[in-house]
Curated annotation (Swiss-Prot):
Keyword Ribosomal protein in annotation: yes
One GO molecular-function entry: structural constituent of ribosome
Gene name tied to this protein: rplR
The protein's name in its UniProt record: Large ribosomal subunit protein uL18
Record carries keyword Ribonucleoprotein: yes
Length: 122
């Protein structure tokens, strides 16, 4: 009998294939997205140094106070704007977008649009 592979396992495989091809450097770090059922997280990562330069999520107090629900596109857009603003404050203007194996649609797209509106280039 065949065993069904979970969607999350497939996503992790897609993410691993992409991660083999892209890395974040200090000049152009990687904007990584993680999506859970209730929250969304974004990090700007320098893979060469192995450090997270900037992070934002729907768990931040600045976003929690602005939204009623944290698992929707409005909250994701606010996270994108916040991570973009924090990255620009740290001197990061261009990034490589790592969608984390998720389809570029819905919350992931809203986060990317918010980061672009904040001034990040990718």
């Amino acid at each position: 009998m065949l065993k069904k592979v979970s969607k999350n396992t497939n996503r992790q495989g897609r993410h691993q294939r992409v991660r083999n091809k892209i890395t974040g450097t200090s000049q152009r770090p990687r904007l990584n997205v993680y999506r859970s059922l209730n929250h969304i997280y974004a990090q700007v990562i320098d893979d060469v140094a192995g450090i997270t330069l900037v992070a934002a999520s729907t768990l931040d107090e600045a976003i929690k106070s602005q939204v009623e629900a944290s698992g929707n596109q409005d909250a994701a857009k606010l996270v994108g704007e916040l991570v973009g603003k924090r990255a620009l404050e740290k001197g990061v203007s261009t990034v490589t977008f790592d969608r984390g194996g998720y389809i570029y649609h819905g919350r992931v797209k809203a986060l990317a649009d918010g980061a672009r509106e904040a001034g990040l280039k990718f």
